[in-house]
């Protein structure tokens, strides 16, 4: 199935849910497939992991896809771009931009063992934050019929990050507001609290849930 995903991306095939004998039965299977898929892509591109994405951080999106938690994915080092980068649409099947608050991990957070990380642990481990975009490729998915386990297996559609200037985290990051403009016209607005109430809660979920490697200094 991981090889099939790679082929779909290589040919820019339309996103299709895995079904029948290939149906993904639970979230554990979904993340196992994700790791296999990403491992192949890393091997092909001679790349490494630079960090993680966290998706479905709003209750509305979780309800839409029938899941009660966020989802995660890996970000590859060669897919990190700096502000001002030019991205070719032809490199994607259907590229999308998602506005993000990007955090930079300032000290290692080893994999959870006996005690889960608290909010204060996360807050003290983050060295700086940046506005940015996540690049996704939904491959013309039918949003009325998305299997969340297939989405997770497909690395949650992540195709990289565009990173702005990092600054020390504001005292009230939950209250920070952002505006997306196109040609001077406001398209959308949002605030830090839209992400699980505070962006650091999303990082807390990630540190406690997803990664066997832990979060390392320098990770996004």
Where are these regions (language model features)?
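A conserved acidic, glycine/proline-rich C-terminal tail/linker
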Residues: 199-220
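Catalytic-core "active-site belt" of small-molecule-metabolizing enzymes
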Residues: 1-198, 212
């Amino acid at each position: 199935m991981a090889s099939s995903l790679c082929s779909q991306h290589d040919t820019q095939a339309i996103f299709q849910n895995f079904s029948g004998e290939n149906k993904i039965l639970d979230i554990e299977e979904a993340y196992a497939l994700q790791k296999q898929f990403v491992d192949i892509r890393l091997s092909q591109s001679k790349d490494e992991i630079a960090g993680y994405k966290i998706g479905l951080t709003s209750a509305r999106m979780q309800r839409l896809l029938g899941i009660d938690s966020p989802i995660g994915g890996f970000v590859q080092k060669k897919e990190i771009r700096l502000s001002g980068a030019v991205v070719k649409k032809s490199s994607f099947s259907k590229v999308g931009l998602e506005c993000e608050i990007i955090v930079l991990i300032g000290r290692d957070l080893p994999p959870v063992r006996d005690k889960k990380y608290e909010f204060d642990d996360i807050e003290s481990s983050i060295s700086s934050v940046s506005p940015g975009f996540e690049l996704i490729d939904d491959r013309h998915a039918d949003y009325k019929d998305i299997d969340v386990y297939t989405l997770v297996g497909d690395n949650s559609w992540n195709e990289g990050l565009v990173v702005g200037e990092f600054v020390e985290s504001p005292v009230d990051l939950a209250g920070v507001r952002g505006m997306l403009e196109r040609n001077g016209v406001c398209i959308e607005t949002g605030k830090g609290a839209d992400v699980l109430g505070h962006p650091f809660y999303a990082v807390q979920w990630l540190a406690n849930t997803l990664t066997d490697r832990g979060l390392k200094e320098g990770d996004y």
